[in-house]
Amino acid sequence: MKWKIARARTTKITRATTAARHDLEHYCRDLNSWPRSWMGLEKDLPPGEQLLALFRPFLENLATSDLSPKTIQKHVDNMWALGGEFIRDLHSDSSLRKKPVELVLRQMIEYGGPLLYHGREDQQRSFDSTCRKFHGFLTKTARGRSRSPTNSPDQAGF
């Protein structure tokens, strides 16, 4: 029996140069209309617009990431679903309207996402993954905002 010598196959394609990078508009062409698409009543529009302001930096970060276009699109779709579920929760619990949108959102996605209204198990897993990723992004960027030169331990004046 002849033994083949295992050797690594090399490719002449440089993946870094062939991977097309897209901007946010490529993945969500109608991003500015998301709040209207989530809206059930006119009073849903302001929280929807606040959500979009929270979503946009995360979506821009995704669009410029090294993730595959298919994965990025899946995350974008899940973020749109998160907005819809958020507005649905506002309808089912009117006391949430009195709280800041960011606080309600953080509580909603702290351990994954809310249950999807008409979602299959695989969709729920994907949705939860996106929500955890978004929660991590919010936490990381909040830490970055809270650090200012005057809050540095070196300059605290102890």
Where are the language model's segments positioned?
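Charge-rich, intrinsically disordered N-terminal extensions
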Residues: M1-F158
